[in-house]
Amino acid sequence: MASQVNALLLPVIESTPLHQITKVALTTTLTSKQSDYKFKEIAVPLTKSLQLYEKAQRRQDLRASLKALESIIYQTHFQWNNPLPRHAHLFQKHYHFLLTHWPFENHRDLVDSIAVNNGKLNSTSSRSVWLKADWITLFNVKNPWVQTPPSLMRLSGTDLDTFTPERIFLINSLGNHYKFLIANSHLSYNHKKYPSPGVQIPVRNALGEVSPAKQIAQLFARQLSHIYKSLFIENPPLSPENELALTAVFYDETVERRLRRLYMRACARAYTTTNADSTTEPLMFHCTRWEVD
């Protein structure tokens, strides 16, 4: 199937006004050995964008044509051909640890604490708490609702819950990543505002009853899925290799001004890691800026 689809897509890619670096990246990604699922994950949205581009060209709709090309540029360099940062891989590796230690706020406990706090609601769910706090301290409490799957039961409780150097690196890198995106809201996907990442456990009724443990565990799973999608799929950091590739596009003297502007718009939300090779110090992030005419 992949070879047949590529036979249709590759000539269309070559006919676009995109820079050769983007064309090579696209071609390499499509023709590399990968599962059918992974291939479809790229080929389906790419086909849609190329169809939009061709239709816009026939209608001489410049705006729609440029929008389609912008989408292809962004998806090629930021998603399809962009290696995940180290803390994304660690997120997957230590998923169960994050699931059992992800910070939460139990609304029942929150209501009960009002009397102790002289009638004041002492919530920890505000973004300011997450922006100021040491993230390691936020992860110190293990939640009682997520059960350890049988496949992990062979590991000791210490192994499952210990704050190893790798896990500390992961948590602090996630904290830096979240704080960076909050501080640079112009980078967010569709101008989305990032809420407090803690899990909220609501009361079900006026009696203060909470949901069954299984439903609460699902809240943690959904929140981690949302966090991963927000940081690594919708708005991922640009890899150092891709930053260099795009820099070569911007400073290519043969590139016409219109095409350079197209790439500038497509890459307006670019940011990357300052210390991508670090394995001890948590990752830091900075906005990528290309000073071009």
UniProtKB/Swiss-Prot annotation:
Subcellular location: Mitochondrion
UniProt keyword tRNA-binding present: no
Domain of life of the native organism: Eukaryota
Gene Ontology process terms (BP): mitochondrial genome maintenance; mitochondrial tRNA 5'-end processing
Pfam families tied to this protein: GEP5 (PF17053)
Alphabetical keyword list: Mitochondrion
Coiled coil: none
Any single GO CC term annotated in Swiss-Prot or TrEMBL for this entry: mitochondrion
Known role: Essential for respiratory growth and required for maintenance of mtDNA. Required for cell survival in the absence of prohibitins.
Family per record: Belongs to the GEP5 family.
Identification of the protein by name: Genetic interactor of prohibitin 5, mitochondrial
Organism whose genome encodes this protein: Saccharomyces cerevisiae (strain ATCC 204508 / S288c)
Gene behind this protein: GEP5
